[in-house]
Each structure stands twice: as C-alpha cells, then as structure tokens.
C-alpha cells in the first residue's frame, strides 16, 4: 500500500492473537482504500502475513480506532474518512459497515468527513466518539449515541477555528470517573498547541476548555500515559514545525 498511513494491533478477526490493522490514506486499487488486517504468521520474519480486507469503499481514511462497541466480546473498528464516521465489524456474513455520522459537509469532498477519531466515557458512563473534522481540520467534534436504533449519532461541535487539528486522545485526566478530550493542533497562527476539554454533563453537549500550551507545540501527535508513576495520566506531545517533544505532567 503506497498510501499506508495508520496501523494498530487489534484482534478484529477473533483469533488467538491480534492482527496488524492498517488504513491507507488514498486508494490505489478500486474506488476506496483497503482497510486490511494482517495475521501474524508462524515465522513473522519469513512467512507471508495473510491479509483480510475489512472494507474497500471509503476514501481519505486518515485514522481508525479499535474497541468492542456493542459489548459482544468482539473487537470492532471505527474509521474516520472523507465519508464520515463508520463502524466496521465482523458478522456471520462477512464484514459489515454501519454509518454513525457524516462528519462535516462541504462543497469540496476533500474538505468533508472526519480525520482523527477516539472514544471515551461521559459522566454517567455513556460512550462518546470524538473526531477532528475534516481531515487536518478546524473543528473538534463529539458524537453521542442516538435514542432511536439505527439513526445517525448526535453530532456536537465542541470547539472550532483551528488550523490542522492533528492529535486526539481521551483519558480521565482529573480522576472524576469520566474522560476528558486531549486535542492538539499544529498550524493555528501564533498559538498552535494542546488543549484539554472537560465534559460537564451526561449528554456530551457541554465542555469546558483548558489551554495547556499556546504557541509552544505545533502538535503532530500526542499520547496520554502515566509517565511519572504517580497514578495520574500525563501528556507527551511532539511538534513537527516546532521541532520539539514535551512532557506535560499532570498535577491534578
């Protein structure tokens, strides 16, 4: 895949060990990118990694994420692409695709859809999906489950006005039992950086913004983990244009 962009380990096929799942950015064969799972062979250095195409219908798939969405003990895949937000899961008939959200819409198809994607838990325990829209986009968005089965998820714009939003994570940063959104942007004039958004309600409609870095981090990517051993999640971000890596220590 000449346009291979993201890869993650996940047992999407229900085997005895995980597969390497890759999402290309642009299609090289057919009308869509090939979201593919590669099985680890007996000898990973010599044997062929058998591929299984999970979906080949979407374009500009900038990221994907894995979790058991429906609680059936099978790992599913969420995708962010030009066509929006989709759930890919294994069924008795093969691989199914369910549209959860359209993402942002624009006259230019390449300015539509979603680019980054993660999931988290709201106050009260409800699941949310968070995205950056469109790819390399200007809007931070949250999706919450609809009341009616089969309907598109409810879309809430959390914040907007950025340039090249490119990093996204969720974690319980303040120990209150619900997840915050950690978001990084790289090209916003004078103030590229890192923000944290704290959910204020169970509906996912109200969020409180906390600026962690304004101007010192042109965020290409970030991860959240406890790096100081105190039980609190910290943030590590890397900046392409600022040529730096920073550790933001959580003191909450």
Where are the model-predicted features located?
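Beta-propeller-forming repeat regions
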Residues: 1-252
């Amino acid at each position: 895949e000449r346009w291979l962009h993201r890869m993650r380990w996940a047992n999407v096929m229900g085997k005895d060990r995980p597969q390497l799942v890759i999402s290309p950015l642009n299609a090289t064969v057919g009308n869509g990118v090939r979201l593919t799972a590669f099985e680890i062979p007996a000898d990973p250095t010599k044997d062929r990694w058998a591929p299984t195409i999970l979906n080949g219908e979407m374009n500009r798939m900038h990221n994907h994420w894995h979790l058991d969405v429906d609680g059936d003990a099978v790992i599913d895949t969420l995708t962010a692409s030009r066509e929006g937000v989709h759930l890919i899961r294994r069924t008795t008939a093969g691989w199914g695709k369910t549209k959860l959200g359209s993402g942002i819409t624009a006259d230019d198809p390449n300015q539509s859809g979603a680019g980054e994607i993660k999931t988290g838990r709201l106050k009260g325990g409800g699941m949310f999906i968070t995205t950056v829209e469109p790819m390399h986009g200007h809007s931070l968005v949250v999706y919450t489950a609809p009341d009616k089965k089969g309907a598109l998820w409810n879309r809430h714009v959390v914040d907007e006005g950025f340039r090249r939003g490119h990093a996204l994570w969720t974690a319980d940063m303040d120990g209150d039992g619900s997840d915050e959104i950690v978001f990084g942007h790289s090209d916003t004039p004078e103030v590229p950086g890192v923000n944290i958004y704290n959910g204020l309600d169970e509906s996912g409609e109200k969020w409180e913004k906390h600026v962690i870095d304004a101007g010192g981090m042109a965020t290409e990517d970030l991860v959240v983990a406890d790096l100081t051993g105190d039980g609190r999640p910290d943030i590590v971000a890397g900046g392409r244009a600022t040529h730096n890596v920073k550790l933001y220590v959580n003191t909450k």
